[in-house]
């Protein structure tokens, strides 16, 4: 068997975590457009400052709801704007994201929640809620529904959490800390959790950007 490899274009991170992508951009380039979201017939641009603020208030809501450092929080949904906010909010709060396919069966969801030790789950639709409610393990203390305007609900819940507490959570994460626990499809047995650290994602993102700088770094570039 032949093996091929190429040297990394970017060095492995020695400090920081994934939250720095948003927090640092909000600090140094607050008006820079970070993403666009569908709005009516068009698109709404979201700046670094706006994105950071929405993630922060959502993270405060998670903390107020009992999410502790290192807690696993599951998200069962398609790719959508709320996913991005919740993904980063869980990291800002010091937690670990557990993605679940939106097509997963109740049995699969139960296994993933139990095996991962998740303490909360966010689902996309009422149908998802109906699927997971009967099988929630006792460790799961919170179930949120995206279509119930979960971001606004969490923002309101976190009003009493101060910035210092949030920043302590966010800044305490090291590159080697677990960021996401992704489960395999389970075609040959029970789904297995794959551990991905902040360092894994940072290295991947850094090398992708460096390898496609004409796409990512040119003015106005987007994907």
Language-model region placement:
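Conserved AMP-binding/adenylate-forming core of the ANL superfamily
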Residues: 34-80, 84-88, 105-110, 172
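Conserved pre-ATP/AMP-binding loop-to-beta segment of ANL
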Residues: 30-33, 161-183, 190, 215-223
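AMP-dependent adenylate-forming
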Residues: 21-46, 145
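Conserved structural elements of the adenylate-forming
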Residues: 52-57, 175, 194-219
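ANL superfamily adenylate-forming
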Residues: 127-175
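Conserved AMP-binding A3 loop
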Residues: 45-49, 179-206
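Conserved ATP-dependent adenylate/AMP-binding module captured primarily in the ANL superfamily
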Residues: 71, 102-136, 204-223
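Short beta-strand->loop structural element characteristic of the AMP-binding/adenylate-forming
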Residues: 74-76, 83, 87, 91-122, ...
